[in-house]
Curated annotation (Swiss-Prot):
Disulfide bonds join C133-C230. One of its GO terms (cellular component) is cytoplasm. It catalyses: S-sulfanyl-L-cysteinyl-[protein] + uridine(34) in tRNA + AH2 + ATP = 2-thiouridine(34) in tRNA + L-cysteinyl-[protein] + A + AMP + diphosphate + H(+). Residues 180-182, 342-343 are annotated as: Interaction with tRNA. It comes from Pseudoalteromonas atlantica (strain T6c / ATCC BAA-1087). ATP binds at G42, M43, S44, G45, G46, V47, D48, S49, M68, G158. Its EC number is 2.8.1.13. Catalyzes the 2-thiolation of uridine at the wobble position (U34) of tRNA, leading to the formation of s(2)U34. The record marks H159, Q375 as: Interaction with tRNA. GO terms for molecular function: ATP binding; tRNA binding; tRNA-uridine 2-sulfurtransferase activity. This is tRNA-specific 2-thiouridylase MnmA. GO terms for biological process: tRNA wobble position uridine thiolation.
Amino acid sequence: MRGYLLEFATIFTETLLFIMPYIHSLSATELASNSQKKVIVGMSGGVDSSVSAYILLQQGYQVEGLFMKNWEEDDNDEYCAAADDLKDAQAVADKLGIVLHQINFAAEYWDNVFEYFLEEYKSGRTPNPDIMCNKEIKFKAFLEFAAEELEADYIATGHYVRRREVDGHWQMLRGMDDNKDQSYFLYTLGEQHVGQTLFPIGDIEKPQVREIAQEQGLITHDKKDSTGICFIGERKFTDFLSQYLPAQPGVIETPEGQEIGQHQGLMYHTLGQRKGLMIGGMKEFGDDPWYVVDKDMARNVLIVGQGADHPRLYSNGLIANQLHWVDRTGPTSPMKCSVKTRYRQEDIACTLTPEPDGNVRVMFDEPQKAVTPGQSAVFYLNEVCLGGGIIESYIR
């Protein structure tokens, strides 16, 4: 018996020492205060939300989970596998001893995310539905449901971002893990959303998240990260999009106006794209690969150029609209900051200038490649995410 107790004490101590750097040392007063707060964790069936729930329990909160189903397409292993995700979320909830609620937001997702996705592609732009999903579903529908129906004090998610209160105002900061920082996807949050949301793994790196999950015996510890767009799943993008938008074939031209091929629809192509153009083997043009360098929407023409450094792939700046600022005010005069025009991109030094029409003009310190209308431009001041907007056009 003594040996068993000694072994148990050793394991408990090792586990405690392992997780303490990631959950922070809390005073008795803080633990007592947290025990009066109810937190609803958005649980997706992945490792990040699983560990988020675990950490919040260690911090003394009253924790419950919520599984959201946002798409009504047939779920099976080939597509979104929502049934498997729910099963994993329930297994984690059972392991942690917490309640798991379920909610269907498919109607809200269709109206506010998917229809936007289709309209943008119909216009020849390249949208990011994950950003719209965060804005309309996770930090609107979910937040409202948790507060009104489940009487939550906070919601929590497994996003790799941090928050900080300064002079009574909430800031959103990049996640500590540079490889996983997700502030790019959350720039539409206002400071009131940031104040109502806990991000338990924002100051942890992904390998440590998996280690914590494994130490605690959570079934999701080795589950692959979700990638791509859930409602498309493993299907070919062109096959999926053609179910909802009619193809509009047109010609492919060089920047000089020479016709060299046919495309099936501008919506299937994005700036900087190399694969899938079906225009190889033309000896008179040499061996350099072709890239999409522009779209002429008025003529329904796809413009391609040769070489990864073709001049028309580069822009000196951009115009952004549909702006969201975390502090809800934004800059009123030109400012130096940095911008990302796509996820996991290195910061681009720039000058941001508010325009009279409500847009912003962004000029890069150095020319940038494949700035794509429809994508988001997200602005930073050191580690603080200021906000962002949709790229309306590029400046060459």
